Amino acid sequence: MQIFEIKTHQIGRTYAKPHFFILNKGLNSGKPLDKPCPNCFVITTITRAERESLYYLCLSLKVGQFFAYYLKGSVIPFIGISDAKKVINAALQNYETHQWQMKVEKLKKITAFEENLQQQLSTIAKLKIALLKAQI
C-alpha cells in the first residue's frame, strides 16, 4: 500500500518530498493541481512514482465525482481533509498495481493530447482575430 501524507497547504511553504495539491473549495474540490492555490491540500509521497500514481488516482476520483458526495456547505461547497483522505484510501484499497499503471500511462497520453488541443484552439482563435483585423 502506498504511503502518503495529506495536510492543509500554507501559502509560501515549500516541500522537499514529491508532492501535488488538491483543491478543497468549490465545485472542483478534489481536483489535483501541480501548482498551489490558497484553498488546497498538499499530498506528499516518498517517491515520484507514488506521487504520479496518486495524482492520476485523484484525477480519476474527481472526474468520477467521488469527492462530490462529501462536499459540505451551501454557498461555497468544500471537502474536509478527513473526507478527502477517506476517499483516497478507499480507492487505494480497490486498486491493482499493474492495471493501474496501464491506466496512468493512458491518462498521461490523454492529458497531453488535451493540452495540445487546447493550444490549437487558442492558436485558431488568435488566427481568427488576426484575419478579422486584416479585413478592416
Language model: regions and residue ranges:
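Amphipathic alpha-helical coiled-coil/heptad-repeat segments
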Residues: 95-136
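Short coil-to-beta transition motif at edge beta-strands of beta-rich domains
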Residues: 17-20
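Sequence-specific dsDNA recognition surfaces
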Residues: 1-15
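A short acidic, often aromatic-flanked loop/helix-cap motif at beta-alpha or helix-coil junctions
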Residues: 11-12, 51, 95-97
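Glycine-anchored helix-breaking recognition loops at helix->coil/strand junctions
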Residues: 61-102, 116, 121
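A short, structural micro-pattern
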Residues: 15, 35-37, 81
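Short amphipathic alpha-helical patches
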Residues: 41-45, 77-85, 90-94, 111, ...
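A short beta-sheet element
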Residues: 24-76
